[in-house]
Amino acid sequence: MTNQKQETKLWGGRFAEKTAELVELFNASVGFDQRLAEQDIRGSLAHVAMLGGQGILTAEEVSQITDGLNGVLADIRAGNFEWRLDREDVHMNVEAALRDRIGPVAGKLHTARSRNDQVAVDFRLFTKEAALDLAEQTRALRRVMLAEAEKHLQNEVILPGYTHLQVAQPILLAHWFMAYVAMLERDEGRFRDAAERMDESPLGSSALAGTPWPLDRHATAEALGFARPTANSLDGVGSRDFALEFLSACAILSAHLSRLSEELILYSTFEFGFITLPDSHTTGSSIMPQKKNPDVSELARGKAGRVFGNLMALLTVVKGTPLAYNKDLQEDKEGVFDSYDTLSIVLRLYAEMLPKTVWHADVTKAAAARGYSTATDVADYLARQGVPFREAHEVVGGLVGLASRSDRQLWELTDAELKAAHPLLSAEVAQKLTVEESVRSRQSYGGTAPERVREAVEAAKEKLRQETGQP
């Protein structure tokens, strides 16, 4: 990045003074919006082709500008492009480089176009492509989660299910994985829905009111891969809800990945001991040689905060901007870039890490048996015998209190103690209420019984086949 002696601004005709150096520094966005260079040149190529098609530019002018733009693009891709701070942004840098390459005819590129619709189309292109890319990466992780569910379903690995981080009821590990499959399916859908809504081209809206030039906005929209042009020029250049929706989808996905991260961090501790994370995705301590730190999950959990912040930042920017374009909207891009980059790496890391994570089935099963996780099953047993559930709940609550005071499990209570609580209970009944039986009994649709989880796995696999057209 260079900051050369100021040249005449492309917009400088009405100004008598040069821009102050501090204003140059404060005003410039090229340090980050150069990331839109490819989208900017694609938009310009579509625009100049349309100008030629409408007879606004001659064929020779279109050819010169097109060749020049392709040359600038080649320089950018090769890393030979000089980005200049005094040229403010990606648009002015590209146009000035085009002028340096082909001369004054470059000035005709901006016919019937404003930087307002130019940046809007660039940013929509980027955000739409980012949404579709994150949708694909989310689907890839969803597929990994589904494969893990199917793998652990084979041995019906049991895991404690928690509420309030207290052991609640036993579940299948496959059921736990399928919960994340469901979350990721919705996350993917949010990105695809957002991409569909932002599939409109603002190019041709000009500054805000449209243009007297006979443009073909449908042609440029089609050339850029949009479904249609935006229907209102004010909305086209002044709205950033497409970026807000993208950031919202990013934030919700980040929340889900943060919850996953929190569970994996807990489960990998000595105190839980449920999993062993792969060496390839953990780190050590500079002083404690025994440490194996879950840095991937901790960073994924921590980075959720910045993704949330990106959404809140843009909401705060947009809320006070009157129609149409305001310089405030320069602040729309960095958060989108950052959220996209952050989630892209987190999704790929988890797709790598989860298949290499080892689950200790004996430990998870033993943990599921602790904490009176089958207490609800005892209450359900009484209810099936005709005891009102609220009465059954109170009876079993008393038994849990008795067992906890003597540091025993429910099945360790004596026959006399059980019958004293309720005549329908006995040691024989309590011994049958195992975690395996508890899991098998959860036969309701969406429940954790092996048959129900197997159905859910097959349904999820079929849905993926339908979505992708792949076996």
From Swiss-Prot:
EC number from the UniProt entry: 4.3.2.1
Pathway: Amino-acid biosynthesis; L-arginine biosynthesis; L-arginine from L-ornithine and carbamoyl phosphate: step 3/3
Catalytic activity: 2-(N(omega)-L-arginino)succinate = fumarate + L-arginine
Highest taxon of source: Bacteria
Biological process terms in GO annotation: arginine biosynthetic process via ornithine; L-arginine biosynthetic process
Keywords annotated in UniProt: Amino-acid biosynthesis, Arginine biosynthesis, Cytoplasm, Lyase
Subcellular location: Cytoplasm
SUPFAM superfamilies, sorted: L-aspartase-like (SSF48557)
Enzyme class: lyase
Entry coiled-coil feature ranges: none
Family designation: Belongs to the lyase 1 family. Argininosuccinate lyase subfamily.
HAMAP family for the chain: Arg_succ_lyase
Protein name: Argininosuccinate lyase
Gene name in the database record: argH
